């Protein structure tokens, strides 16, 4: 108290400037985050609508149509929940109670788990599509959507069970006076776990992430090997001077490969940051930046998937030409 009473005007001015700078930075991050969420919601809504129309019109579904359509729905719901949670981070405290905190945060984590499991399944299915007829994976090319849905549901249930400790550890904290709490929003925090419980949870979390990431890494490696082998065979048949024309499946595979590789980096980053926040950090600004980075995949993915759909690209081009012609007239 004495330090505050007898502090110099310069130090008080410096403290005020630092506080204003932090608030300004927080405001910029918030505006950027909500812009990201808006773009992601628009993209996923459009992609979901496209897949619904394809289903209604009776188009023959491809092996990857179900997981891509499901991903758009998952990401749409996840971004909506994230936007609602973010209002308690960037705008104002809503005074949520324990039930609301547990419901929102756990629902958000469940949707993120669905995203991880569905992306893992998508990488496996894309590897199956690319596999040659002589491959042992070729027999799975005619797998039914029911089996795909069952596999995604099984992985998601395992993911939910391991993360169910959040239902106990998430609480409403109207007044953050203890440093032991881990910041989630202005109204919600995570209770610190004992060393034993933290060790058990971290081990289960590591096993879960390692299993799903391993599936994606193996399928990605398999697809890269197949693409490389096909390129060498084509160059051998047609000569090195001619650039071989890519099939639609190969172009789609390369695009999905880049997207899944990016998702892998984001997942590894999220795991590292989550563990470090649990053990060392509790900074709302760092947490806000982490939130922005974590949602890049959900925001970018629908546009990447749409770029592989020739009929969507043609539709958007024709729509753009109509808008330009309308403005000219």
UniProtKB/Swiss-Prot annotation:
Q: Does the keyword Cell division apply?
A: no
Major localization class? membrane
For side Cytoplasmic, which residue ranges? 54-65, 131-150, 231-254, 307-329
Keyword list, A-Z? Cell membrane, Disulfide bond, G-protein coupled receptor, Glycoprotein, Membrane, Pheromone response, Receptor, Transducer, Transmembrane, Transmembrane helix
Give the record's glycosylation annotations as residue positions. 175
Q: Where in the cell is it found?
A: Cell membrane
Mutant lacking the gene: phenotype: Mice lacking all but one V1ra and V1rb gene (12% of the V1r repertoire) show a lack of chemosensory response to a subset of known pheromonal ligands and changes in maternal aggression as well as male reproductive behavior.
Q: Which cysteine pairs are covalently linked by disulfides here?
A: 101-188
Which regions face the Extracellular side of the membrane? Answer: 1-32, 87-109, 172-209, 276-285
Which InterPro entries is this protein grouped with? GPCR_Rhodpsn_7TM, Vmron_rcpt_1
Q: Quote any Pfam family the record assigns.
A: V1R
Transmembrane regions? 33-53, 66-86, 110-130, 151-171, 210-230, 255-275, 286-306
Q: What is the topology of this protein in the membrane according to its UniProt annotation?
A: Multi-pass membrane protein
In terms of superkingdom, the source organism counts as Eukaryota
Q: Name one GO biological process term.
A: sensory perception of chemical stimulus
Family, similarity comment: Belongs to the G-protein coupled receptor 1 family.
Name used for this protein in its record: Vomeronasal type-1 receptor 42
Q: Per the UniProt entry, what species is this protein from, by scientific name?
A: Mus musculus
Q: What is the lineage of its organism?
A: Eukaryota, Metazoa, Chordata, Craniata, Vertebrata
